[in-house]
Structure formats: C-alpha cells, structure tokens
Amino acid sequence: MMLSPSERQDIDLMSVSKSFDDVLRVSKDMMEFMHRGIKVTLYPNGSVMFYHFTDLENGRLYADEVIGKARQDDNDED
C-alpha cells in the first residue's frame, strides 16, 4: 500500500535515517526500515510504501507517525 501526503515534502533521508530504528538501507532516493513490525519505504516527497499491509486506517496513522518523525528530525538538522 502506498500513501502520499496532501502536501509534498522535501525530506533529507540520509540525515533523518540516523534517528530511525531498524533502517534496512538508505539513499538520497529512499529509506527502507521497519515500523511497528512492517517493512516501510519512505521517499523524499513524503510518500510511504507499506509492504504486505492493507489496513488503510492504520496505514494512515502509521504514515502520519513516520512523516511526523522525519519532518521533526529533518527540522532538527537545520
């Protein structure tokens, strides 16, 4: 399942990856990590891909958590 924020983001994935647990791999184009036991890919524009997960309600909640953490950590770097 892929979810995208209503507002396009500009997330520095290399920078924010240091604050995420269970990062599987990261580049300037994507960050793969585990969140609540789910494999997730975050993209710089704020899109979030959940693998083998189809619960839309919880997906929106988890995407908000991920984007919120990434934005907070990205702003902390400024």
Residue ranges and their predicted role:
Residues 1-25:
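Short Lys/Arg-enriched alpha/beta "domain-start" segment
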Residues 25-39:
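A short, structured beta-strand/loop element
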